[in-house]
Curated annotation (Swiss-Prot):
Official protein name in the record: Polygalacturonase inhibitor 1
Pfam families for the chain: LRR_1, LRRNT_2
Family according to the record: Belongs to the polygalacturonase-inhibiting protein family.
LRR repeat positions: 69-93, 94-117, 118-142, 143-166, 167-189, 191-215, 217-237, 238-260, 261-285, 287-309
Keywords: Cell wall, Disulfide bond, Glycoprotein, Leucine-rich repeat, Membrane, Repeat, Secreted, Signal
Organism (species): Arabidopsis thaliana
Length: 330
């Protein structure tokens, strides 16, 4: 092999070695991540966060491509023996699009205001933790947010009406907390696509705002609260709703003239004070789950469609409901 070829091979080897050993991770991001690790008491769950290695290879992280200079775009800490509060340094990851702290029973404190700095955030999941305090109003500043999940925490107080101003929100999941007060009137006027709305297992009270009847939810779950009054505005044959769960509240309205969406696959109204007869129109829906037990319904269960495919547990404990799968009407 001549001298020129040898030099070319040596250059190529040096070039490849340099490229392979070069960190993709931004140094500012790496420094921030190491501060986050320290703030969380250096948990074993983050053992891969070694300052001598490329942080884009660390567990719980994702980096973007060259168009964003390989900045950290996702921080997902799921399970593990993590203790402490949400580190303030989280707000110093400016390219973050996904932030998840989930199934961390020793994560305490409030939802930190530093999160408001994450203007590129599209997904925020803080769930199955011991976070306390209110849902902060500053979340409405995250104008790129598409998915918000704050379920299975100990959050309290009222739901900020400002959440309805999020222009790109597709799902609001606030279930299983200790939220009180009423559902905001503003939730009847989201600026963009109507989001899936899940507010179950809280202590919400009062009537449903009439404004909610103006929009077409795909999924709405208000179950296991203290809501009362009329909920008929959520229905309508012209809507495209797939799932409605109003179970275990104190709703009182007559369903006799309530048409349901012809797209409805899930309907749960159990444990309320709903009256009237089940309309024949309900046989037109492609129901996969159906429960109207523990109400004050009367009359004959309409035949046809899906209504007879459900067993008696979907109908029992009503005032005078009859027909298959219950006893024959007399």
């Amino acid at each position: 092999m001549d001298k020129t070829a040898t030099l070319c091979l040596l250059f190529l080897f040096t070039f490849l070695t340099t490229c392979l050993s070069k960190d993709l991770c931004n140094q500012n991001d790496k420094n921030t991540l190491l501060k986050i690790k320290k703030s969380l008491n250096n948990p074993y769950h983050l053992a891969s966060w070694d300052p001598q290695t490329d942080c884009c290879s660390w567990y719980c992280l994702e980096c973007g491509d060259a168009t964003v200079n390989h900045r950290v775009t996702a921080l997902t800490i799921f399970s593990g023996q993590i203790s402490g509060q949400i580190p303030a340094e989280v707000g110093d990851l400016p390219y973050l699009e996904t932030l998840v702290f989930r199934k961390l029973s020793n994560l305490t404190g409030t939802i930190q205001p530093t999160i408001a700095k994450l203007k590129n955030l599209r997904m925020l999941r803080l769930s199955w933790t011991n976070l306390t305090g209110p849902i902060p109003d500053f979340i409405s500043q995250l104008k790129n947010l598409e998915f918000l999940e704050l379920s299975f925490n100990d959050l309290s107080g009222s739901i900020p009406s400002s959440l309805s101003t999020l222009p790109k929100i597709l799902a609001l999941e606030l279930s299983r907390n200790k939220l009180t007060g009423s559902i905001p009137e503003s939730f009847g006027s989201f600026p963009g696509t109507v989001p899936d709305l899940r507010l179950s297992h809280n202590q919400l009270s009062g009537p449903i705002p009439k404004s909610l009847g103006n929009i077409d939810f795909n999924r709405i779950d208000l179950s296991r609260n203290k809501l009362q009054g009329d909920a008929s505005m959520l229905f309508g044959s012209n809507k495209t709703t797939w799932s409605i769960d109003l179970s275990r509240n104190m709703f009182q309205f007559d369903i006799s003239k309530v048409d349901i969406p012809k797209t409805l696959g899930i309907l749960d109204l159990n444990h309320n004070g709903i009256t009237g007869n089940i309309p024949v129109q309900w046989t037109e829906a492609p129901l996969q789950f159906f429960n109207v037990s523990y109400n004050k319904l009367c009359g004959h269960i309409p035949t046809g469609g899906k209504l007879q495919t459900f067993d008696s547990y979907s109908y029992f404990h009503n005032k005078c409901l009859c027909g298959a799968p219950l006893e024959i009407c007399k």
